[in-house]
């Protein structure tokens, strides 16, 4: 929960050759299932006989789409959708996705989860050649690169294949042309992308398998790192594997926090991975206590695992207000902090007079952890021992999460004892790097643990390029507004 990193975007795409269902409604339900991955904006684009229309706006799925807006989108054989958290670009209608562009060979709609590491160079290169950008997000750069390649190739999939030689970093994409639905996973497989089907011929791509249950399709497989899967207008599926060179290096924090607990990623149930983390944590950092509680939502599974391994009873120490957005997915620190007291309420009968082990999924800035510990103290807890089911964050992420500076990471500013004192805990223990790698032992992939180790599976910029680039763009836009 708390003051944590956000990756966060969710992508969804559906093809229904026989039109046995309503692809717009299916996408709407799919986005509901992926709402936890982004709560700032959302959108849907639908393809009706080669004509793509879209609606998007700032807000939750239920706020952006009522029945009137869904009806306006009409019917079609395929659709894509997106829920967004702004890891790159400001929060406004223009930056919402899917992005819909028109070019000399037709239309293109795209939904993107991830971050490009060479966005600044690519944007400058494109602008020097006359490109005019309407957003401050790197997804528009991907659109431009694909369109450039499309003008030189015979198919959209070949254009995407060529574009992957130019774009670097993390990207899980669903792309829709007038004739095809295409799913793309970057060459390192940083972000998840899964495929599902049903007996009626519907094919679905999504960030997580939890979206499949929402629309009634079965999980088939995860896309491989570097893979392009193409569904043409006849429903024929084929895979392009030119860039499939290695196993995915998926962000391990998908298992710790991002993914919904009922999802399965790389054949590893997320719930079991989190319980495993708790079990390992109990072995690494035991402490005498009366009750183990978890911080909703991601900390609950780890707390269960800790309780199982330690033999200490598990209790429901918090009630969560479901109508408050996730605190780490609030765009400013002030909003994150103000949301905590509204979101969590202590069950005093569980903690009063007891030595409490509080299991949470991470500590980034430390401010939320301090507030939660205080809530437990105010609820009557005699001792509060904090256990974290992830290692300390010591380095920025360049691949789609919102850790952009060591200055914002408490583990870069304080040692363990100082952090413990800062958050008001009686003791503090983090899961080890080895432990976090072992939590998803059934996953058929490697992991990116760069934010914990400063060792990344791909080249990184020399500086926090994302923030520097956004400042540059926003200044240019402000100057333009003044001139107008």
Where does each model-flagged region fall?
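Generic beta-strand/beta-sheet core signal
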Residues: 111, 176, 184-185, 196, ...
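A conserved beta-strand->alpha-helix junction
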Residues: 135, 140-143, 314-325, 422-440
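PRPP-dependent phosphoribosyltransferase catalytic core
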Residues: 164, 179-180, 216-222, 374-484
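Phosphate/diphosphate-binding loops
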Residues: 162, 210-211, 218-219, 223-227, ...
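Short, glycine/charge-rich flexible loops or terminal/linker lids adjacent to PRPP-binding catalytic cores
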Residues: 311-356, 367, 394-404
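Conserved short alpha-helical segments that host acidic/polar catalytic motifs at enzyme active sites
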Residues: 1-225, 230-289, 295, 383, ...
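Flexible loop/turn segments at secondary-structure boundaries
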Residues: 87-88, 118, 182, 190-191, ...
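Secondary-structure transition/capping motifs at alpha-helix termini
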Residues: 131, 152-153, 286-290, 308-315, ...
């Amino acid at each position: 929960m708390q003051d944590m990193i956000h990756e966060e975007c969710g992508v969804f795409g559906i093809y229904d050759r026989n039109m046995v269902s309503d692809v717009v409604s299916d996408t709407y339900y799919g986005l509901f299932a992926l709402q936890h991955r982004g709560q700032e904006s959302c959108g849907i684009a639908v393809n009706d006989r080669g004509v793509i229309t879209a609606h998007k706006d700032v807000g939750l799925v239920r706020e952006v789409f009522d029945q009137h807006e869904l009806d306006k989108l009409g019917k079609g054989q395929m659709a894509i959708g997106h829920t967004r958290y702004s890891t790159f670009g400001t929060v406004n209608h223009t930056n919402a996705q899917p992005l819909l562009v028109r070019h000399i060979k037709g239309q293109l709609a795209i939904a993107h989860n991830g971050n490009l590491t060479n966005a600044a160079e690519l944007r400058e290169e494109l602008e020097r050649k006359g490109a005019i950008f309407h957003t401050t997000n790197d997804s528009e750069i991907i659109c431009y690169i694909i369109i450039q390649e499309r003008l030189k190739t015979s198919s959209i999939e070949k254009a995407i294949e060529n574009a992957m030689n130019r774009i670097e970093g993390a990207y899980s994409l669903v792309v829709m042309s007038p004739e095809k639905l295409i799913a793309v996973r970057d060459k390192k497989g940083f972000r998840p992308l899964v495929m599902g089907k049903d007996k009626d011929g519907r094919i679905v791509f999504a960030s997580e398998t939890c979206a499949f249950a929402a629309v009634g399709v079965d999980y088939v497989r995860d896309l491989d790192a570097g893979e392009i899967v193409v569904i043409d207008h006849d429903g024929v599926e084929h895979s392009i594997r030119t860039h499939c060179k290695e196993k995915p290096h998926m962000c391990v924090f998908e298992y710790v926090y991002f993914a919904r607990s009922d999802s399965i990623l790389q054949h590893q149930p997320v719930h079991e991975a989190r319980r495993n983390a708790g079990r390992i944590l109990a072995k690494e950092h035991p402490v005498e206590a009366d009750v183990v509680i978890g911080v909703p939502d991601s900390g609950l599974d780890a707390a269960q695992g800790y309780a199982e391994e330690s033999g200490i009873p598990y209790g429901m120490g918090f009630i969560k207000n479901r109508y408050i957005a996730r605190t780490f997915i609030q765009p400013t620190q002030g909003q994150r902090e103000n949301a905590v007291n509204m979101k969590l309420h202590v069950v005093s009968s569980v903690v009063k007079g007891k030595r409490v082990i509080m299991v949470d999924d991470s500590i980034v800035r430390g401010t939320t952890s301090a507030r939660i510990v205080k809530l437990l103290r105010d609820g009557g807890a005699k001792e509060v021992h904090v256990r974290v089911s992830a290692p300390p964050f010591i380095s920025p992420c360049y691949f789609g999460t919102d850790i952009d500076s060591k200055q914002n990471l408490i583990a870069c500013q304080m040692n363990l004892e100082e952090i413990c004192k800062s958050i008001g805990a009686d003791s503090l223990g983090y899961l080890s790097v080895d432990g976090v790698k072992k939590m998803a032992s059934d996953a058929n992939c490697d992991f990116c643990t760069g934010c914990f180790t400063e060792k990344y599976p791909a080249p990184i910029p020399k500086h926090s390029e994302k923030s520097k680039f956004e400042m540059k763009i926003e200044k240019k836009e402000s100057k333009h507004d003044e001139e107008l």
